[in-house]
Amino acid sequence: MDTMSNSQQNKGIGRKVQAFGSFLSSMIMPNIGAFIAWGFIAAIFIDNGWFPNKDLAQLAGPMITYLIPLLIAFSGGRLIHDLRGGIIAATATMGVIVALPDTPMLLGAMIMGPLVGWLMKKTDEFVQPRTPQGFEMLFNNFSAGILGFIMTIFGFEVLAPIMKFIMHILSVGVEALVHAHLLPLVSILVEPAKIVFLNNAINHGVFTPLGADQAAHAGQSILYTIESNPGPGIGVLIAYMIFGKGTAKATSYGAGIIQFFGGIHEIYFPYVLMRPLLFVSVILGGMTGVATYSLLDFGFKTPASPGSIIVYAINAPKGEFLHMLTGVVLAALVSFVVSALILKFTKDPKQDLAEATAQMEATKGKKSSVASKLSAKDDNKAADNKTAETTTATAASNKAEDKDSDELLDDYNTEDVDAHNYNNVDHVIFACDAGMGSSAMGASMLRNKFKNAGLENIQVTNTAINQLPKNAQLVITQKKLTDRAIKQSPDAIHISVENFLNSPRYEELINNLKEDQD
């Protein structure tokens, strides 16, 4: 019993971690286009860019200081409470941004967005039932405005000092490690600090003055390489190019060019934030680069800014080009290997679970994950299952939060397409973690199949799991995510597939839709 209890507890923790990662992805992924646009502007038009332009370079600062944090805050608030949550979240985040204008408040936005969205949701739940008829617009607007007013001041007066304190602690910690000659360990603080946009505070507040003093005495300083090495970032992005999926994979190529050649390291930060375990990759990559340069006694005479391979090549002391390249390549290699393992690690256990579940189902006489049609036993039960579908789904929805993954999948017959009644289905939703990559491709593919089958009256869309509407009719998810989709939309029909782009269940679904809607 203890073993089973521990196993269920571990699975529960795993699902919570997965849900948290999904929430981070849903905040960051929709805004990657803004990151890339800003990255191009910064890489091309700044003083050390490819084509310096003083006028256009003025766009870079406001975009990273205001636009991107506000977009992230809006996304976080909207995930919790739709447009009202997003709008007030973005409004309140201005308090943190204005209080600390020299530091891009990405982390502050990721805190304020969901927090204010949740508060807006709770405010509406309290106010709306108590609103007199005819005063709905007045109460809605003023409740949102008052909450935005309060939380903006909260961000300015409370959260901003906390963020400033965190910055100070990181800076002091890095400086102490530098003075203690534990340079590779500096990466333990530097790399995570970079990801939350504290890189300028550490680089220019600590490394530049210390490096200038060191270079004045020794002719060069390794401190100029600690934060600016492009190796750890490009290692993560190459891992996404090879092992990533959907939008993350598609955008990693452009991000890699911007990061490695343009020196705009911030472009890879969202990719790490989407998978927090990748902090380990950039830390180990950074440590490798610092250790390599320490062994080779390599350093720059002046700061390497931006941290581009081009700037590194130009700044490398005469005769030490290979030393410079070695530090970058080894840092990138270690970061890539660890990132690849992490990306695969988050996938392999799920694959193993799916295979084990399929084997278990085959042993029990039920349909396996790769079967193209039902067994005779399942066929005999199909009619009875259809009749009992509504009762089963209702009973399961009432207890969805209390059941583990396997129980939910069994209760909802997620792998038995014939077990459901599709009379009233006119909308199919594909759902994945971020609601952009794999689900979008799956929806497009099924839309074409419906068109060829004469089912053009049925709408097919895609969304993130945590944005599934409560009144969803039919939801298609990958098997490892179906339990979360059920809890989000407990009254819907749920179908599990192993692969959005290649599943025999689509043909079964089309046949059932035609039969039930004739």
Swiss-Prot record:
Active-site annotation: C432 (phosphocysteine intermediate)
Main location group: membrane
Gene it is expressed from: mtlA
Name assigned to this protein: PTS system mannitol-specific EIICB component
Organism: Staphylococcus carnosus
A GO term for molecular function: protein-phosphocysteine-sugar phosphotransferase activity
GO cellular component: plasma membrane
The keyword Transmembrane helix is assigned to this record: yes
Compartments in which it is found: Cell membrane
Transmembrane regions listed in the UniProt entry: 32-53, 58-78, 143-164, 174-194, 282-301, 322-343
Superkingdom of the source species: Bacteria
